[in-house]
Amino acid sequence: MIFDRTVTRRLPQARLWICLAAAFAFCVLMLPAAQAATVQPLEIVTRNGVQVFSVEIATTEQEKETGLMYRKELADGKGMLFDFSPEQEVSMWMKNTYISLDMIFIRADGTILRIAENTEPMSTRIIPSRGLAKGVLEVVAGTAKKYGIAPGDRIGHPLFNGK
């Protein structure tokens, strides 16, 4: 029997490429599901009523550092909630952020501490919380004015005292 070594060497390589392609396809298919899992509802209770938002949650250092950078748009009713547990002085900026935002600084009890409205895109100017904040909600600029959101209003989300 004649034994061809080139064929036997190619079989493991072919299997490796098939496995790598399958793993890549699996990761690509699972990516939207992983991103969708980080989106949660958030309520803001104002004098005008309750406004419900769908927010991405930024908890890791990488997520907090990147935030909404490089995004070209943010729909009304969408946003990103940054978890800065435990409550602390927080500073934000707009570096590499193409869209103007309203930044809502939130205390540990869920009350709004301060709102920085209509932030300047791409700016490296520091935007401080001016007090202790456990979270920051970023929404498209004009949202606070549109819905009458003001300091003292309440946020309903599990990050704030489990509510």
Describe each model-derived feature in a short phrase.
Residues F3-A21:
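Bacterial N-terminal signal peptides that target proteins for export
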Residues R5, P32-A36:
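Long, non-catalytic terminal segments
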Residues T8, L31, E87-E89:
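Short linear sequence elements within intrinsically disordered, low-complexity coil regions
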Residues W17-P32:
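Bacterial N-terminal signal peptides
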Residues A36-K163:
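Compact, glycine-rich, soluble single-domain proteins
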